[in-house]
């Protein structure tokens, strides 16, 4: 296994504060452990924003105090997210009305 992963899966989520505690319990005790059992997933770690968030769109900067959660998974290959195990594990459907998310696989640029 090389020092650097072949690719990354980045999951960024904003959670409605009304379900944030429930979301965190579920993510930490069910979702993340299940994800780490999937073939091709080396490891993963969750992060949460600290302090004010600054976003710039079309030259306009906005600041916000909302929390953003980011999970970084190291994958053996981009197809790791297409396995049956990964597709079964994905489901956070019961939280769908309460989250805004972005998921993307990142591969080496060069």
Report residues per predicted region.
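Macromolecular interaction modules
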Residues: 1-110
């Amino acid at each position: 296994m090389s020092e650097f992963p072949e690719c990354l899966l980045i999951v960024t989520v904003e959670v409605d504060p009304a379900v944030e505690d429930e979301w965190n319990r579920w993510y930490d005790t069910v979702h993340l452990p299940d994800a780490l059992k999937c073939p091709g997933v080396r490891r993963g770690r969750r992060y949460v924003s600290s302090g004010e968030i600054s976003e710039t769109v079309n030259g306009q900067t906005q600041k916000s105090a909302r929390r953003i959660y980011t999970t970084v998974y190291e994958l053996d290959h981009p197809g790791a997210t297409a396995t049956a195990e990964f597709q079964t594990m994905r489901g956070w459907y019961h939280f769908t009305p309460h989250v805004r998310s972005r998921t993307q696989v990142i591969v080496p640029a060069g």
